[in-house]
A protein has these predicted regions:
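Conserved donor-binding/catalytic core segment of Leloir-type glycosyltransferases
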Residues: 6-24, 30-33
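Aromatic "clamp/platform" in nucleotide-sugar-dependent glycosyltransferases that forms part
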Residues: 94
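Nucleotide-activated donor-binding/catalytic signature segment of Leloir-type glycosyltransferases, i.e.
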Residues: 43-47, 53-77
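Conserved acidic donor-binding segment of nucleotide-sugar-dependent glycosyltransferases
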Residues: 126-127, 131-138, 147-152
């Protein structure tokens, strides 16, 4: 077991502070899992879902794959173990700016699947470090999960995730972005005087 999860199965991870929050798209996640199993019944034997967050038990019974409701976890080390155990992270948010959960998954080398909404398409480079599904499209969400789990090169995805975080979301990268914005603002101010 990895973080209380089976190590002989592929793991689909869903994370939210409150998994029943409609904005997090749980209904689309449940529908996409149903479609995934209907199109690829063999996945029922080798794939499970881990749900991290409050009210995870309420959702686990709705899924057509075996589910591990992990509840709310605050211990950082345990959270990292859970992310690192996953093969794909799915965030079907209906509205989100720059979700920390995608950064957290990528920092653990886990590719993400999410809808084309808000800042998600800026974080996930389609079919490079994850899959960007059409907005509110459970079929495409299912296709994204299948692509990551069965078609893509897992090592390439992992490497691309780690590179994306290092280049875009590390403290150094963020500081450099702030310096660039500051320099542009100062140049504009001097220009307009």
């Amino acid at each position: 077991l990895r973080a209380g999860l089976p190590d002989d199965k592929k793991i689909i991870l869903f994370v939210s502070q409150k998994v029943t929050d409609e904005r997090k798209g749980m209904s689309f996640f449940v529908e996409a899992i149903d479609k995934l199993v209907a199109q690829h019944p063999e996945m029922k034997e080798n794939t499970v879902v881990a749900i991290l967050g409050g009210h995870s038990e309420d959702v686990a019974e709705k899924l057509s794959l075996p589910a591990f409701p992990l509840g709310y976890v605050s211990d950082e080390k345990t959270i990292v173990q859970i992310y690192s155990s996953a093969d794909v992270f799915v965030l079907p948010s209906l509205e989100d700016n720059l979700p920390n959960t995608i950064m957290e998954a990528m920092a653990c080398g886990v590719p993400s699947v999410g809808f084309k909404v808000g800042g998600i398409p800026e974080m996930i480079d389609h079919q490079k470090n994850g899959y960007v599904a059409n907005y509110r499209d459970a079929d495409d969400l299912a296709q994204g999960m299948y692509w990551v789990l069965e078609e893509a090169d897992a090592e390439v995805l992992k490497s691309n995730c780690l590179q994306k975080v290092a280049h875009n979301y590390s403290q150094h990268a963020v500081a450099m972005n702030y310096i660039e914005v500051y320099n542009q603002a100062m140049a504009y101010k001097n220009y307009s005087l």
